[in-house]
Amino acid sequence: MDSFNNNNNNNNNNNNNNNNINGEGITLRTLLNSCTNTSSNEQLIVNNVNKNSNIINNININNTPSPISTCINVNKIELRGSSNGIFLNSKIKVPLPNSTLLEQQQDGADEQDKKQQSLSDKNILFSSGDKEFLNHGSNNIITDQNTLLYQLQQQQQKEKEKENDEIMNHDDIIGYNEENEDNFFNEGMDPILAHSIEHHLHNHHHHHGEFDTQENEDTSGESSDESENIDEVLVYTEDIESEKEKKRERLITSPPSFDPHTLYSMSQSLLNCSLNNNNNNNNSISSPSSSINNSGNNINLNNSGNNNVNSNNNTNIINNSNDNFISQPLFNPLSMPNNEQYELLPNPTTTTSTITSTTTTTTITNLPPALPSFPSSSSIKSLKNSFGSNSITSSGELNNVFSSSMSPPMSPPNRNVRSLTFPGTNPINCINTSVINSITANTNCINHHHHHHQHNHHNHHQGHNNINNSGHIRKSADDTVTLSPTLSSGSSSTSSSNPHHPNHNHQKGLNNKTLEKLSCTRKEIYELIEKKESLIEKQNLIDEGYSENADSFENLSEEIQKINEKIIELENLITSLSNSNSNWSLNGSSTSTISCNPLSPRSMNPSSSTSSTSSNLTNSLRKFSQELKIELRPLDLRAELYSSINTSPRGSASISGGSGSGGGGNNNGCFKTSSNSSINSPIQFFENENESIDSYEKKNEEQFESLTQLIRENQLYTKPIEFKEIKLLEKLESNSKSSNIWQIEYKSTQLVLKQPKDQDSDKNIEKRKQLFNGSNVSGSNNSGSSGGNNHNHHHCNNSNGSNSEVIPSKYTMIQHKNLGLLVGWCGDSIIFESFKGMNSLHDLIHRDGLKIDMALFIKISKDIASVMGLLHSKDVAHGNLTSRSIYLDRFQIVKVSFPKLNATDLNNPAIEPRYMAPEMTRMEEDQISCSIDVYAYAFVLWEALTSHLPFRKFNDISVAAKVAYENLRPKIPTSCPLIIRKLINRCWAPLPSDRPTFNDILKLFDHLEGKLFFSSPGILWSLNNDQEVERELQKKERFNEITEFLRGKKEIKFDEVAIVEKVGAGSFANVFLGIWNGYKVAIKILKNESISNDEKFIKEVSSLIKSHHPNVVTFMGACIDPPCIFTEYLQGGSLYDVLHIQKIKLNPLMMYKMIHDLSLGMEHLHSIQMLHRDLTSKNILLDEFKNIKIADFGLATTLSDDMTLSGITNPRWRSPELTKGLVYNEKVDVYSFGLVVYEIYTGKIPFEGLDGTASAAKAAFENYRPAIPPDCPVSLRKLITKCWASDPSQRPSFTEILTELETMKSKFIKQLSFLNDLIQNPDDDYNNNLNYDEEVDS
């Protein structure tokens, strides 16, 4: 680590590799060159050999790792003949500018003893060599990196004149040295310099006699222990240049504001040459009081993670009657968010510490070079959005406006906002990066609490001072920091900020309304700049030969020019607001006023700046500055959109974006209002500060229900809307070539109306027929014709003949919360749900630079798949699934535009060529299906992942040909998760049959979200093909074993059975577990004892014993006294328990096997003319191999005369004909079978939410059935629907069911293999049949 230690004598430490530098005439360049030549484990020693011993100017910087940050401090120093001074609460003196004379003020021995006794807990004892001195740790002066750059510039200018300057050095340490007071002017002093100082003292006493009196009184007698800890330093400097007397009276301007490139480049350059980045360097420096520059700010920057950043802050005193009073360092990090103001409070308590010269210091890790640090989080009280100046209050609070970051507006956003603090450090000890510029020759006035005023005898703030900084910081449209206060002529007088001071005045700042207006104006400038950059990029693409939709970009140059004019207009507005509202007065009786620089950031003449460093940058520094622009991204753009969906709240975000419609335009229109077409910065788009995403989803569902209720109540699908019922709000901008888009209001609901530009009434009527399947549209024909003749206000008129009922179409049956709803029609115009406040995914990615993180990506992908699954279940293809037809609002709600009517029209396809499936390009009509949407879906996923337009370097014609005939696809980035890469490759497969369905895709994303198939918890029962074969063999072996044993046995003696325990009770019997001849058996003791004498019962039981089947519970025999039946005992439990009690989840193959086995068992029973009549999941049992066994059959037929209807069948599974008391046949079991299949697939109880009786009644008399999930395969959906048909003759037999299941099996296997391959197969994700575009940026 680098350590700068004070060498208190002239003895050199003759260690290995020592570098001895004579202190006479030392300059900054000499020092830096010497530091550059040092290496690891070297010691750099600078000896003070100047014989003038009355000037004490040594540096002590401790740089060792510790949770405590140590800063260099300045001892109180006073110029002879003056009682005025600059008060710095510290003890160590630092190098001051050329020709500056210093003297350490003498304190009496008794006063010194009092100070030693009254040290508060904020004092830290340092040991330097053989002497000790005190450091007030809570009032350290903080570094200022801008000033260091200015020092280097000034030093270069002064090198040619250094022979005219006299260097005064001293080799004593800073402390309470009684010999210093009388030896300030000695024989080695420059007489010109002495004359200048005396001249300045004369002016100073003349103008500030009040302060002389106050300080003399305070010096003669101090009344509090706190005031005794205050050190006083009075420093006067002159800028002695070659012009001598003429320039001696001129005021020295403050360091100029550096542009970001110069600031960071030169900081890094100094850092590399002065500190070497070597952790083991031990550089010991005792610096003379030689002049470094004319800025009073010294900076030590450290690029190592193990080094502390220490410095002190000296302030130049010009040769004038103005005094600068500094106590508290400024906290102005360079890269704080825009319009954010920290309110820093003094630390209420500090801890007493005694630290020697080996004290460790805070380490700064994981920071890029020259990255400023933030104040400690303990010092941050509140964060406010504001635009104003630094303010001061009597309570000691320090309000600072932090400057904006220096990266360009288009820098990639990083949404990870973190407070960069020093762990364990005092909030005062941080990097000071403020820059105070002065346009005129006046000085800044900085107030502090510890100045010894006449009425100030007590310190009420424990060393925490207020700073009245006159700098006004704002970020220009070019994203550079401008800190340029303009000081009017006159002397700035200072006063105490102590609340007891009689002349204390509160300063006045900008009012809240002006601040808010300034903030909004700045945001609008940033938006315009981002929009301009996007348009320039599009123009460049067109110039490179990319001609997609080139017609829509014809006026790009004009639009860019308009944006530039608008930016200038807004900057002028900022100027006027600043000039009219930003003046304020200093505290006390100051006559000086400070105002913002009236010049616009773009109109400022760079030649007026006193800094010319940027013009002298080398190529390497320019390159480095460009790298820093990327690395040091704007902190106001850092939000955690990437970490979580529920993060990155932006309360100030304001969406004024597209008011799109559900129907979309030619490109599914991202419609924008003509008044405002831009949105906020992309990372400020999403806003979910107070509520979670789930709550926004709930609101979306409520809005969806409200809109569907509006449609139902007004019968909008069956009758048109009268034009007089709607209100035209505004015409929306759209890329649609076929329609005019209007924002309308209907019954207090905002909607979108698409007015066709084509006045062909027949064509418009045909389109309306397709959407609404209207049987009576003649009434609106005339209105459609008149609409064309009467322009906008008559296009919705309809005649009185359009009141007849219209039959709903399949399009009116498509309703989903994530789909833009079809609302109705008015004349020839179609009305859709409005997407106001939403922006298309295309615009968010390509216009606003939004980066999609994985959590948001999965949400968008799943919502789209859910909508598309519903459309395909209705046999409707969307036809235009692109990033332009997908919309998002600030709460991450996804909407997909309404499907196109010409979705599969090969002659007039609705979709863009780069999203078009290859079979459409090849005009293969027999291959056109809903899978064209799956193909387009893959490109939407790719676009969201890469933030690039598909095939951006090809025109439309080239893309269509290369995709269709060369199988060209964009290259998927390797940073994309493997499972997503595989999914995309499957979706854009060349053959439609190889593409998955949206139901498969939806289940995949359910799995990625931690859910597999069903939301209910439980274990997954899976089955593969090998297990299926093995279990079939086991089932047959056990069945054959039992059959052989029972051959010839019909009756069992009850005393041959050992009853173990009761295991349950059913409708007809109590069930017990028993042991019979070594076999576990289920003993069902019938409740109706009269049955034992019924020969029919005995004959029925006998027939059951002979009818063995692997999927039917095996009957072992019966006992007449008492009447009971013996069956095999199945320890797997019932299917009802598995699905609804244990909540076991089933994979597709297990589902298929259960359904298939159940069909086999029921087919066997029906083949021997046996009806079950109580087929429910409770009567379906599983053995240890999870094989299906049907139980409790056959008895209902015998007991039909004795049992009530409710006892025959459970009401939930009861067929309508049984409920109605009609004649029935074996089809009652088919009805129940359909409900059991529904249970197996969904894991839900049939008619969930209704009791048994109500469900049976609604099923019989209202034809009510449970809702089949949209992700259910179409073939299985059709089978279930057939099985629970109201008409028994429409239900299939179990033989027909088995035939359908055999054809369905391949789809189940394909579904299983698709999911398993995506999740488990580690093979390469690339498709060998595809050619990947290597030119596409991945």
Swiss-Prot record:
PTM note: C-terminal tyrosine kinase domain is capable of autophosphorylation, in vitro.
PANTHER family attached to this UniProt entry: MIXED LINEAGE KINASE DOMAIN-LIKE PROTEIN, SERINE/THREONINE-PROTEIN KINASE TNNI3K-RELATED
Gene from which this protein is expressed: pyk3
Disulfide feature: none
GO cellular component: cell cortex; cytoplasm; cytosol
Catalytic activity as recorded in UniProt: L-seryl-[protein] + ATP = O-phospho-L-seryl-[protein] + ADP + H(+); L-threonyl-[protein] + ATP = O-phospho-L-threonyl-[protein] + ADP + H(+); L-tyrosyl-[protein] + ATP = O-phospho-L-tyrosyl-[protein] + ADP + H(+)
Annotated protein name in UniProt: Dual specificity protein kinase pyk3
Annotated ATP binding sites: 699-707, 727, 1063-1071, 1084
Compositionally biased tracts (Basic residues): 449-463
Natural source organism: Dictyostelium discoideum
PROSITE patterns: PROTEIN_KINASE_ATP, PROTEIN_KINASE_DOM, PROTEIN_KINASE_TYR
